[in-house]
Amino acid sequence: MAQNRKKMWLMLLVISFGGSIIYIFPYLQYTFYDSMMAELNFTHTQMGNIMSVYGALNLIAYFMGGIIADRFSSRKLITFSLVVTGITGFWFATFPSYISMMVISVIWSFTTIFTYWPAVIKAVNQLGESDVQGRLFGFREALNSLGALIFSSTAMWIFTKSGENFKNVVIFYSVVYVVIGIFSFIFLPHDKGEEKKEKVNLFAGLGYVLKSPMIWTIGFVIFFGYAVGSIMGRLTPYLTSVFKMGVTTAGIVGIINTYGVGNVGAVAGGLITDKMKSSTRFLRWCFAIMAVLLVIFVAVPGIPSLLMVAIIMGLSIRLVQTAVRGVYFVPLDEAKIPAKYMGTAAGVVSVIGFAPDAFLFTVYGKIIDSMSEVAGYKVMFGSLIGFCVVGFVLTTILIKMFKKRTAEVGAASAE
C-alpha cells in the first residue's frame, strides 16, 4: 500500500510539472511582454491578437477535448502535447512573422487544451480513489505553481546572465517541454480499456446542463474571476511603462505575479473554503476584497517613487484572485449536479468561464494603442472593479439558488 502511494505521488509530480510548463509559451508575454514585443517587432494590438486567437480556439478545445481523452491513453496525449509544444518553441525562437506566430498560437491551442487539458484531469482522477481526490487535485494546483516558479526563475536567471537575451529563454523552455514529455511517457501508466469503451451519446446531458440557470451563473462567476486574473497578468508591462520599472526587475515581479503567489493563494483558498463549508460564500468575499484593492491600485499615481506601493497592491490582488482560481469550479458540487452530467457541466462552464481569452486582450490592446499608455492601463484595470462587482452579485444569487436546490434535493430524498 505504501509503495502504491509513493508511486501515486511520483506520477502526480510528473503530471504537475508537465502542467507547470505547458501554458508558459501561450502566456509567455505575461512575464516577458516588452522583450517579446521588441524581438517580434509587434504592436500592442498584434500582441493582443496572438492571445485572442489562442483563447478563441480554446473555447472549442475545452468543450470537445473530452471526446479525445475518452478514446486515447492519457499518457500518449500528455506526451504528445508536451513534445509538440516544445518543438514549436524552437520555431518560435526564430522570432517569425506575425502570420507565423498566429499559426503557432493555433498549434498551441491544439496541444495545450484539446489534447492536454481533459487528458490531465482524467489522469489525475485515475491516480486514486474518491477519498484522495481532493488532495490529488489540491496538490496538483500547488505543484503546478511551484514547478512554474522553478522553471521561470531559471529562465529569468538565464535571461539576466545572457545579457537579457530573450531567445535563450525560449530555447530553454523548449528543451524543458520535450524532456518532461519524455518523462511523462516513461512514468505515467498506460490506461487500458480505451479500446473497450462503451458507445455513449456524446451529447447526453447537454440539454439538462444548458437549461440549468445554476450552470450559466457558475460559468459567469468563473468568467469574471478568470478575467481579473487574465488582466492582472498585464501587471508587468504596466509597471514598466507607467512606473518606469527596470526590465530585469519587471521579469522578477512578473514571475512572482504569474506563478509565485499561486502556491499561497490556491492552497489558502482551498483551506478557507473547507473551513467556511461554502465555496460560493468564499468567492463572494474574494470579489468584494478584490474590488476594494483595485480601487486603491488604480488610484495610485503613476510616478516611480510609488513603484513599491503599486507592486504590493498588484500582487495582493493577484493573491486573492489565485485563491478564487483554486476553488471556482467547486460550486459545481454545491449545485448538486447529477454525477452522470458532471463532465458535460464542467465543459460548458469552462467554455463560458474561459471566454475572456477570446477577446479581452484584443480589446484592451486596441484601447492602449489608441490612448496614452497611462490612460489605457488605467481604463483596463479600472474596468476590473466592475467585473468584481458583477462577480459579487452573481455569487449572492448563486447562494440563494443553492439554498433552493438543497431544499428540493432534501424534499425528494424524504419522499
Residue spans for each PLM region:
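Cytoplasmic helix-loop-helix junction between adjacent transmembrane helices
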Residues: S105-L143
